[in-house]
A protein has these predicted regions:
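A well-structured
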Residues: 1-186
Length: 186
């Protein structure tokens, strides 16, 4: 008897006809992220060391909302690709999402760089009032010694899409074609 691998449904993330990647909600997510990032870019000029805690928390919460949608979009694309690495539509979506995430990440990079460059006293003041966000904010600051300038960080983000991520996707597409026949003895 030959085992037939069943496909999982990604409809809980983004409903699509025939399990495909043609969900209208998917396009809505791209649009929402674009809108939210454009709005988020407006806070760049408001970032300052002595900013009020409530203003800072609003910025962090806004970032969280966008990040949740981005993660959902990325998960959908990754799972669609993993389900069938030979599916051209899934490959295209995976590449589109990776490029889109790099672009959006580059546009919001300024916040992380500002946060890592903030003096310790003001960072502590803001973290002390940040509740559940404290751990996230502390972890961001741990990467301070390994952070480059904004132009350099943008180059790294773009390079990752066409560099290491592209190689991983190629490897997955090739090795997913392998078929192994097993004969169970007993």
């Amino acid at each position: 008897m030959t085992y037939k691998l069943s496909r999982w449904s990604l409809n809980d993330l983004f409903p699509a006809s025939h399990g495909g990647v043609d969900s209208p909600e998917l396009e809505t997510a791209f649009d929402q992220i674009e809108e939210q990032v454009t709005t988020f870019e407006g806070v760049r000029g408001k970032l300052r060391a002595d900013m009020p805690v409530d203003e800072f928390l609003h910025i962090v919460q806004t970032s969280e909302v966008t990040t949740r949608i981005v993660n959902k979009l990325d998960a959908f694309a990754g799972l669609a690709f993993a389900a069938d690495t030979q599916d051209q539509a899934a490959q295209t979506l995976q590449n589109r999402v990776q490029q889109f995430m790099a672009d959006m990440g580059n546009r919001t990079l300024f916040f992380g760089l500002w946060w890592k460059g903030l003096d310790d006293a003001n960072a502590k003041r803001l973290m002390d009032a940040s509740g559940d966000y404290r751990y996230y904010l502390e972890e961001m600051r741990h990467f301070k010694p390994h952070t480059l300038t904004e132009p350099e960080e943008k180059i790294v983000n773009i390079k990752d899409v066409t560099g290491s991520s592209a190689l991983v996707n190629l490897y997955d597409a090739i090795t997913n074609r392998y078929v192994f026949k097993l004969k169970v003895d007993g």
